[in-house]
């Protein structure tokens, strides 16, 4: 079983390696006199117990590592598990189609919605094609085009946030990166349809916020949301990225802390060990939250929806 264990999970990795070795040995020689099944079961129970112990006391830096886990489910994974009849739409109708943003119409429990999200890649070629989940201006303009389409057809909007940040390249800046982000912030605040945003991995600065202005903002348990990466903060304050763990703790980037500050509404629990351990389970929990949020927002008239969203934005910074 290959789970790409992180540094703080190495004791778990050692147990899982022993389990794999015993299973391999059992397959090679079925006439062994020892009862391998009992030993494997004992080790599995020990692994679960150890995982619970480690994950009960995670620090902010460890959670940041989990948010970046290479096997963590991405937007298209959640679309596959939660929605039906997904029809992807491409292009910003001005420059190009940015593969770091995916979006289109789909059905959530039979209800038409517009779903938009950042998309990273897993293999090298896919990572490059998706630009490591860092959108250029055309990505945010594509997202806005789909949001405006959703408003015209009175479709709720669901966004999934998972980016280290907007792409900072020269070309992106020349094409108006800051303007594209600012325009999205302005336009999203005035959309006359329900908007539900969920941070599923990294919520990096303006690159995340550009599809993160909504009536409901949720976070998965082991996701992060911040104005800068811990490494970036450490490089500025302490002149060394090695201080990233200290920066992560000081910045308050985790879901429980942000909920305390009333910057997000809900924390969606993940399976033991993180979302990558059981993508279907976390997708089921996320779907339940999305349906509950939609049910709540459906009771509001358009003016009430806009007023509540405005008040939400104006209350940022007040605990």
UniProtKB/Swiss-Prot annotation:
One of its GO terms (molecular function) is acetyl-CoA carboxylase activity. It catalyses: N(6)-carboxybiotinyl-L-lysyl-[protein] + acetyl-CoA = N(6)-biotinyl-L-lysyl-[protein] + malonyl-CoA. The keyword Oxidoreductase does not apply. GO terms for cellular component: acetyl-CoA carboxylase complex. InterPro entries: Acetyl_CoA_COase_a_su, ClpP/crotonase-like_dom_sf, COA_CT_C. Pathway: Lipid metabolism; malonyl-CoA biosynthesis; malonyl-CoA from acetyl-CoA: step 1/1. NCBIfam families: accA, AccA_sub, PRK05724.1. Belongs to the AccA family. Component of the acetyl coenzyme A carboxylase (ACC) complex. First, biotin carboxylase catalyzes the carboxylation of biotin on its carrier protein (BCCP) and then the CO(2) group is transferred by the carboxyltransferase to acetyl-CoA to form malonyl-CoA. This is Acetyl-coenzyme A carboxylase carboxyl transferase subunit alpha.
